[in-house]
Amino acid sequence: MARPIVAIIGRPNVGKSTLVNRLCRSREAIVDDKPGVTRDRTYQDGFWGDREFKVVDTGGLVFDDDSEFLPEIREQANLALAEASVALVIVDGQQGVTAADESIAEWLRTQPCPTLVAVNKCESPDQGLAMAAEFWRLGLGEPFPISAIHGAGTGDLLDRVLSLLPPKHEEPEEDEPIQMAIIGRPNVGKSSLLNAICGEPRAIVSPIRGTTRDTIDTRLEREGHPWRLIDTAGIRRRRSVNYGPEFFGINRSFKAIERSDVCVLVIDALDGVTEQDQRLAGRIEDDGRACVLVVNKWDAVEKDSHTMPMVEKELRAKLYFLDWATMLFTSALTGQRVESIFALASLAVEQHRRRVSTSVVNEVLKEALSWRSPPTSRGGRQGRLYYGTQVASRPPSFTLFVNDPKLFGDTYRRYVERQLREGLGFDGTPLKLFWRGKQQRAAERELARQQNRLG
């Protein structure tokens, strides 16, 4: 059974994201003094006592302004409310009741979802009750004075929330979801892909660059296995970003890469690979994440039977360090090949977690040596590769034991990695190779002996 959902509703800059961070004991929601920082609806795990629930944070609601993407924000709030068990409408106790609060309350009174009023910014316990009393006029029941920053009053509020949630049932323990981060430059179609995958508008889609500021987690199931999809803010050159909510969104995007199992790097088919795309690809490789390259907006490209292989060759030439990643040409607009993303991502994760026996590794290395011997130095010393073994997964990592790592240049090291890939597979995941020489092995053995004596 899915966890019940608590929707956070309110006008801009009343402290919704601060309250979400308080309820979920995290700093996932972006907090900034500028109104309207949260645009999409974002989900986090919350708990109180022995109950667990989902908290959905929505964009600031405005009913009398249709500029930019405010209509889409209102639609996101509608969708959040439709799936919620309880709605928390957040108001500003220091400002008192505003016309916007009254408009939101009028709308909420038409909804079937039970609603509670949380009067935020009531830092003073004595004044808080007086400030909250004004909000009885909204017609939504008893207002709860709280301070989202300090936590005052949130316990009473949560007790009331739990009383409105559906009865608790024994739930089987869920499988750990596969974490998939959807990353890319602004306006390459990340949110459109997320919406196409989910079959509903989970993220605001707009031609305005940088529409998504939060990382948006979406849970869904494919072939009996849970997934968590993370749509990130578009990542730009650092010098082009001000130190505001967009800057924090970009930092959140890099953290999303770190906590992901697989990254979907979205490339704009019309723009091709940019320098920023290359930097993102480098970040994925440095962090050792599995990857699928998605070339979006393929429907907008004039093409014939030769176009796809030609474009793939051009793109791979600029993303040569991700030559192990599968490339997929999609259109979020038409849905073309969107479902294939899951199959490729699942395969990449499987390879990312895979382990191979030492005997199989050495069979591949033996064949590689028979085709091409290690190089010889100017002094006449030839490199010797004795054996190898896999020492880790996520990503697959191998230690190769040699006479002297300095005798193995980059060209031969790349050759060995290619042979391991050809012999063992590992499509969609980076490999890490560690080259260890005799002196290093001897030092490690001596250290182990000393530790055994001390033990």
Swiss-Prot record:
The chain positions of domain EngA-type G read 4-169, 178-353
Q: Which GO terms describe its biological process?
A: ribosome biogenesis
Q: Does the keyword Ligase apply?
A: no
Report the coiled-coil segments. none
Give any GO molecular function from the UniProt entry. Answer: GTP binding
Q: Where does GTP 1 bind?
A: 10-17, 57-61, 120-123
Quote the record's binding site residues for GTP 2.
184-191, 231-235, 296-299
Alphabetically sorted, this entry's keywords are: GTP-binding, Nucleotide-binding, Repeat, Ribosome biogenesis
Concerning InterPro entries, the annotation shows: AAA+_ATPase, G_ENGA, GTP-bd, GTPase_Der, KH_dom-like, KH_dom-like_a/b, P-loop_NTPase, Small_GTP-bd
The record, for Gene3D superfamilies, names: 3.30.300.20, P-loop containing nucleotide triphosphate hydrolases (3.40.50.300)
Pfam families with a match to the protein in the record = KH_dom-like, MMR_HSR1
Domain of life, per UniProt, equals Bacteria
Q: What residue stretches are annotated with the KH-like domain?
A: 354-439
**What does the subunit comment say?**
Associates with the 50S ribosomal subunit.
**By its UniProt entry, which NCBIfam families does this protein fall under?**
GTPase_EngA (TIGR03594), small_GTP (TIGR00231)
Q: What does this protein do?
A: GTPase that plays an essential role in the late steps of ribosome biogenesis.
Instruction: Please give the family membership noted in the entry.
Output: Belongs to the TRAFAC class TrmE-Era-EngA-EngB-Septin-like GTPase superfamily. EngA (Der) GTPase family.
Report the protein name in the record. GTPase Der
> What would be the name of the gene that encodes this protein?
der
